[in-house]
Amino acid sequence: MNSNEFLLDSGFWGFLYKILTPVEWLQTWIMKIVHDFFVMLGVSPIGVSWVLAIIILVLVVQACIFPLFYKQMKSMRKMQALAPKMQRIQNKYKGKTDQASREAMSRETMKLYQDNDVNPAGSCLPMLIQGPVFMSMFYTLSAIPYIANGKRDALGAFDVATAKQFTQTDVFGIVSVTDNFTSAAASGKAVIGIFVFLMCFCLWFMQYFSMKRNMAAASMNKQTETMQKAMLWLFPVMYIFSGVAMPFAVLVYWLTNNVCNLCRTLWQVYAFPTPGSPAAADKEKRDHRNENARRAKAGLPSLEEEALAKAKEEAERKATQGYQRQQPVRKRKKK
C-alpha cells in the first residue's frame, strides 16, 4: 500500500481487471449510495457507514445470484434423478472406444438432457459469477488508498474526496479498513485474526455439514472420503495465509459472503438434499408428516390408512377372483 505504483494496474492483472471495470464501477456506486443513505439516517460518514455499505453490497450480490442458485439446485435434482439412465447409457457403450460409439453415446446423453430440460453446465454458473465479483471487490478496495493519495485515477463513484473519507474509516476505533495483518497495530491484529478465524470456521463448517449430512452412502468410498477430508482442512488453511494479506475491508466482504454461503448451504441441504443422504431421509420423513397433516386438515385419510385400504381392496379382489391370474390377450397381427 505504500508503493507509488498500484501493482494490480500493470501486467496480466492490469489487463484482467481492465476487463472487469464495469463490475468495479457498479460496486463503487452501490457502496456510495448505501453509504450516503446511512449518513442521511445520522450514521457517521467516516465510521461504520462504509462497513455497512460493504455488507449491503454482499447482500445485493447474493440476492442477484440466488435465482441462479435456485435454478442450479433444481438442475442438480434433475441430474440426480437421471443418474440411473445415465448409468445405463454408459454401460451400453462400456469398452467401446471407436469414434462411432463415442459419438452415439454423446448423442444419447445430450438427448437425455434435452428431453428432461437439464443443463449440465448450469451448476457452474453461480460460481463463475461470484469469482469475478470477488476479484473486482478486492481490486476496488485495494485501489482506494491510491485514489486517496492521488496515485491513481478515480474509479466509478470513488473520487479523491470519497476515497479519503473511506480510508479514514476504522472499526471500533481499532483497525482501519485499509489495514492488513502486517500493517495493523497489536489490537488491530487481534480483530483481523478474529475475522480470519470466523471466515475459516464458516468455510470449514459448511464443508463438514455437507459431507456429514448431504453425501449419499453409496457414493462414499475410501478414496472419496479421503479427498473430502483433505478438502475439509485444505481450503480453511489457505484462507489463513490469504486472509492475513488482505485489507480489512476485503475481510469484511469475505466474512459476510461466507456467512451468506453457509446459510444458503444449510437451506440447500434442508430443501434439496442428495438422494440417499441422511438429509434426504430426514426430508422424506418430514414430507410424510406434512402430507399427513395436510390430509388430516382436509378430512382425508392418512397415507398409512390409504395404503391399508388399497391393500385390503387388493386382497378382496384376489379372493373374489380365486387368485387366478388374468392372462393377457394376444393381439393378432393385421394382414
UniProtKB/Swiss-Prot annotation:
Record localization: Cell membrane
Alphabetic keyword roster: Cell membrane, Chaperone, Membrane, Protein transport, Transmembrane, Transmembrane helix, Transport
Renumbered residue ranges of the record's region Disordered: 277-335
InterPro entries (alphabetical): YidC/ALB3/OXA1/COX18, YidC/Oxa/ALB_C, YidC_ALB_C
Protein origin, superkingdom: Bacteria
A Gene Ontology cellular-component term: plasma membrane
CDD domains tied to this protein: 5TM_YidC_Alb3
GO biological process annotation, one example: protein transport
A Pfam family: 60KD_IMP
Membrane topology, record value: Multi-pass membrane protein
GO function term, MF aspect, one: membrane insertase activity
TM regions (residue ranges): 46-66, 127-147, 191-211, 232-252
Regions of compositional bias (Basic and acidic residues) in chain numbering: 281-294, 307-319
Function of the molecule: Required for the insertion and/or proper folding and/or complex formation of integral membrane proteins into the membrane. Involved in integration of membrane proteins that insert both dependently and independently of the Sec translocase complex, as well as at least some lipoproteins. Aids folding of multispanning membrane proteins.
Family according to the record: Belongs to the OXA1/ALB3/YidC family. Type 1 subfamily.
NCBIfam families attached to this UniProt entry: yidC_oxa1_cterm
Subunit text: Interacts with the Sec translocase complex via SecD. Specifically interacts with transmembrane segments of nascent integral membrane proteins during membrane integration.
Name by which UniProt lists this protein: Membrane protein insertase YidC
